[in-house]
Amino acid sequence: MENPRMPFEIIEIGAVKLDKKFNIIDTYSSIIKPKLYKKLQPHIKTILNYDESTLRKGRPFDMVYREFIKWCGEDYIFGTWGSMDLNILQTNMDYYYLKPMPVPLKFYNVQQIYADMYDEDGKIVKLKKAVEHLKIEVEEDKPFHSAVNDAYYTGLVLKTMSPRDLADRYCYDIYNNPKDKKDEIISHHKHYLEHISREYHCKEEAISDIELMAPICYRCGKRLSPKVK
């Protein structure tokens, strides 16, 4: 039965660390022993390179997470293939009452960046297809659907880009929204201005916020006058 506090349980954390030129300089990988969902779903079994016997040898999530964050270091930014990884990670963190991540959490959605740069229609594709399109070698001992291997290939996709390509393409995970005015985010991108506001108790409170209801045009810097129904 699904637990509403943690619908998806993380069973593996894998990552690669990149330098400023997107060279892989370190890796992290650890299997997690599940607490809630100890039996793998059939469709999950078909794509993983291990089974329940491997999971039983894993370590608790909170132990692995603390080790992983320590490995990340002080100055880092996440890059993920898709937008859901950080959301699921934070759901698991909440279940174990771990200290929340910074709010809002800045990261690079490499899947979306790839789509914007390499697909005329901006179509989202799976990691394997992107790797094939970029003619990145798939190593025999690094099959897909392993957290650390998928991170490895995501890193190689980034390697085909330059830091300048990513300068304006960051986004924010808003699993935890800003709670106060001082924590709000106003970020200037090349083609738009992003404003992540604090939470409001009701619609009337939001409407009464002049800065929220009259956003700034990213081109001219003037405030707009939107209509609210």
Spans of features found by a protein language model:
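Residue-level signal for well-ordered alpha-helical scaffold segments within enzymatic catalytic domains
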Residues: 67-70, 87, 91, 129, ...
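Conserved non-catalytic scaffold segment of RNase H-like nuclease domains
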Residues: 1-90
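Conserved beta-strand -> loop -> alpha-helix junction used to position metal-binding or nucleic-acid-contacting
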Residues: 101-114
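A short secondary-structure junction motif
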Residues: 91-97
